[in-house]
């Protein structure tokens, strides 16, 4: 049940933040966060996060676009890393999408 998977301490009302977080950390190197990779055994991590985000976009209130300029910097993730208690490397350059 995907709804039972803890999304690094964020509620499912913030799928955009979660998706951006994984876009930053996951493709570069293994992601060490506060939950076991076994939680994603039935589904690839990236696909699962994107699927949850697309489901949320269909809701009555669309998710807030946190970065309207389309750029993402390491400093945007300080709070997320602190909430999980994990140190997750992130590329310094902005990510375009």
Swiss-Prot record:
Top-level taxon of origin: Viruses
Example of a GO biological process term: DNA replication
Region described as Disordered: spans on this chain: 42-68
UniProt entry keywords in alphabetical sequence: DNA replication, DNA-binding
Signal peptide: none
A Gene Ontology molecular function term of the record: DNA binding
Family the entry assigns: Belongs to the herpesviridae polymerase accessory protein family.
Primary role: Accessory subunit of the DNA polymerase that acts to increase the processivity of polymerization.
Name of the protein in question: DNA polymerase processivity factor
Species name: Equine herpesvirus 1 (strain Kentucky D)
